[in-house]
């Protein structure tokens, strides 16, 4: 993939690494067949190839991540299925990791999303907190009928 980073941008080791990864991608699309989010949603931007385009544009323009970029990068499950099928050996996961770091540094998430992410980061790594949250969830389950059903957009 052709990139258009400036020399000043390439002085940053992270951008230089991203440039190397981006140049390895030949747009063959083999990754799309193994990507669970693409298979489920059918949106090109939810495939590794689509995310690579979004990340490339974000990095080249050195812009704050948009809600669309964040949505599609967040949908990546980090399952690495795309990397196992890529004939060019694109280190997709490293590129997505860089994008996620940039998103966390520059993107201001809505309060509800920010709070949910903080709670999950607090609860999931600790088995005792996770067990306690499951007990609370079981007790709160009857209240679920009053909540709207989320749908992917």
Model-derived regions, located:
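Flexible inter-domain linker/hinge segments
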Residues: 1-2, 151
């Amino acid at each position: 993939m052709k990139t258009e980073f400036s020399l000043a941008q390439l002085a940053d080791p992270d951008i230089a690494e991203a440039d190397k990864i981006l140049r390895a991608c030949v747009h063959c699309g083999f990754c799309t067949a193994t990507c669970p989010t693409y298979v489920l949603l059918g949106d090109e931007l939810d495939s590794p190839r689509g995310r690579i385009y979004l990340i490339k544009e974000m990095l080249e323009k050195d812009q704050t991540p948009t809600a669309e970029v964040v949505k599609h990068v967040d949908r990546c499950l980090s399952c690495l299925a795309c990397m196992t099928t890529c004939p060019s050996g694109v280190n997709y996961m490293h590129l997505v990791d860089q994008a996620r770091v940039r998103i966390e540094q520059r993107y201001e998430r809505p309060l509800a999303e920010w709070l949910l992410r903080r709670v999950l980061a607090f609860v999931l790594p600790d088995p005792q907190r996770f067990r306690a949250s499951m007990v609370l969830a079981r007790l709160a389950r009857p209240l679920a009928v009053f909540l709207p059903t989320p749908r992917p957009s």
